[in-house]
Every structure is written in structure tokens, then in C-alpha cells.
Amino acid sequence: MSRICDLTGKRAMVGNNVSHAMNKTKRKFSVNLIKKRFYLPEEDRWITLRVAASTIKTINKNGISAVLKKAQTEGFIK
């Protein structure tokens, strides 16, 4: 399973490890994914999603319904 957020499409970024001598080696910054259940009051059911921690903060701020609707318009959910 790829490490991609179900709602925002966030995926790993590539960067550098930089030593004190400024030597650079490639590395990967992975997404902080969490498997979480959300309750949809409109449909009276629970859904399980793999979302980034930053997405959970967005859901707490805007609500699950608004975030799901935005994810559908951006094409992350069918």
C-alpha cells in the first residue's frame, strides 16, 4: 500500500541529509499517516481512512463533510 493521504493526496517528499561539513545525501520525508475512523452524521455510518496528521487538524477545523466534499472536487475520492 502506498503511503498517500486518502483525502489530500499528500505523499513523500525528497530532500537531503546535510552533515556539519555540508555533505548532502538524498533522503525521503515520509507522510505522518494515521488510520482513523470518522463518523458521518448525514449517512449515519463510520468510515475508516488513512489520513495525514495535518489532515486530521483540517477535519477538526472544517468538519469531515466539508473536507470530503473538497476531496471529491479535487479528484482524490470517486
Swiss-Prot record:
Cited InterPro entries: Ribosomal_bL28, Ribosomal_bL28/bL31-like_sf, Ribosomal_bL28_bact-type, Ribosomal_bL28_sf
Residues making up the signal peptide according to the UniProt record: none
Regions that span the bilayer: none
UniProt KW keywords: Ribonucleoprotein, Ribosomal protein
GO biological process, one term: translation
Gene3D superfamilies: Ribosomal protein L28/L24 (2.30.170.40)
Entry-linked SUPFAM superfamilies: L28p-like (SSF143800)
GO cellular component: ribonucleoprotein complex; ribosome
Keyword Zinc: no
Pfam family, one: Ribosomal_L28
Entry GO MF terms: structural constituent of ribosome
HAMAP family, per database record: Ribosomal_bL28
PANTHER family attached to this UniProt entry: 39S RIBOSOMAL PROTEIN L28, MITOCHONDRIAL, LARGE RIBOSOMAL SUBUNIT PROTEIN BL28M
Family per record: Belongs to the bacterial ribosomal protein bL28 family.
NCBIfam families the UniProt entry points to: L28
Protein name: Large ribosomal subunit protein bL28
